[in-house]
C-alpha cells in the first residue's frame, strides 16, 4: 500500500487549486471512495465517512445556489472542511461557492476545480486510489498473458521459470514481467505488473539480460532462443 497525499492527486489530474497552500496539500488519503455530500448539504451529518474526498457536481452546486441560505451553507461547509477530510473537488468547471471559499481559506483547506464531468472525475479518482491503496505483495516469478488471461509462474530459483515463459512468448503470448512481480488486490481482483525498471526485460541462466522489443517481438525472441539453444548445446 502506497502513501497517497492530496498533492499526488492534484498533480495526477492537473486540478486547478482554489484554496490551500503547499502545506495543505500534504493531507493523506486513506480511502478510495468519494463522497457526494447530498445529506450533508441538507444538514444531516451522522454516519458521514469524513475521511473520503468530497466531490461537488452539478446537483450539489445547483442545490447550494438555489436552496441553501448563508447560515445553512456555513454549517455544512464547516463540517465538510474538517480535519479528517482530504480535500474538496468541484467538477464540471463550476465556480467555488463564495461561502465555501471563505471558510476554506480561513482553515487553509484544499479546494480544487476540474473541467471534467462529475462521473468522469469520480471514476478517475476512485480507480487511481484503488490501485495506490491496494494491498500488495512482491512475488518471485514470471507473469505471462496467455490467451488474454494472466498466468503467474512461481517456483524455486533455478527451476526454469524464465525458460517456460520464453516458450510461451515464442508461441505468441505476451510477457508481463520477469523475476519480480508486484501483485495487488483491488476489490476481489488480483492484478500483477512488473516494476518500470524491469519492464520488457528477461533474464535467463547463462545468458545476459535481454530486452524484449515489442515492435520486433518475433525477431527478438528468435534471436534469444537461438542463443539459449546454442548455450544449452555447449553445456552438453
Regions found by a protein language model. Give the residues of each.
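Structural motif
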Residues: 52-55, 86-89, 109-112, 150-152, ...
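Conserved nucleotide-sensing/catalytic segment adjacent to the nucleotide-binding pocket
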Residues: 177-233
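Charged, amphipathic alpha-helical linker segments immediately N-terminal to NTP-binding catalytic cores
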Residues: 84-87, 93-128
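Short, basic, glycine/proline-bearing loop/turn elements
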Residues: 57-65, 84-87, 200-205
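Gly/Thr-rich phosphate-binding loop signature of adenosyl cofactor/nucleotide-binding cores
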Residues: 1-81
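P-loop NTPase nucleotide-binding/switch module
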Residues: 128-148
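Fold-independent oxyanion-binding glycine-rich loops
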Residues: 57-59, 92-93, 115, 147-149, ...
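Glycine-rich phosphate-binding P-loop
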Residues: 148-176
Amino acid at each position: 500500500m502506497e502513501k497517497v497525499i492530496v498533492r499526488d492527486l492534484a498533480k495526477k489530474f492537473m486540478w486547478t487549486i482554489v484554496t490551500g497552500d503547499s502545506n495543505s496539500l500534504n493531507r493523506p488519503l486513506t480511502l478510495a471512495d468519494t463522497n457526494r455530500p447530498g445529506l450533508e448539504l441538507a444538514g444531516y451529518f451522522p454516519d458521514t465517512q469524513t475521511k473520503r474526498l468530497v466531490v461537488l457536481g452539478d446537483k450539489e452546486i445547483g442545490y447550494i445556489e438555489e436552496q441553501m441560505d448563508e447560515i445553512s451553507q456555513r454549517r455544512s461547509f464547516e463540517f465538510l472542511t474538517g480535519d479528517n477530510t482530504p480535500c474538496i473537488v468541484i467538477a464540471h468547471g463550476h465556480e467555488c461557492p463564495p461561502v465555501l471559499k471563505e471558510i476554506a481559506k480561513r482553515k487553509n483547506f484544499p479546494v480544487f476545480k476540474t473541467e471534467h464531468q462529475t462521473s468522469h472525475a469520480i471514476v478517475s479518482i476512485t480507480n487511481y486510489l484503488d490501485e495506490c491503496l491496494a494491498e500488495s505483495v512482491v512475488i518471485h516469478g514470471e507473469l505471462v498473458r496467455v490467451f488474454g488471461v494472466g498466468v503467474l509462474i512461481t517456483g524455486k530459483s533455478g527451476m526454469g521459470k524464465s525458460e517456460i515463459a520464453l516458450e510461451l512468448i515464442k508461441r505468441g503470448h505476451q510477457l508481463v514481467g520477469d523475476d519480480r512481480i508486484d501483485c495487488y488486490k483491488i476489490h476481489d481482483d488480483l492484478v500483477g505488473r512488473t516494476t518500470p525498471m524491469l519492464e520488457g526485460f528477461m533474464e535467463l541462466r547463462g545468458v545476459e539480460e535481454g530486452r524484449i522489443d515489442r515492435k520486433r517481438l518475433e525477431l527478438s525472441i528468435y534471436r534469444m532462443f537461438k542463443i539459449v539453444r546454442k548455450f544449452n548445446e555447449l553445456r552438453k
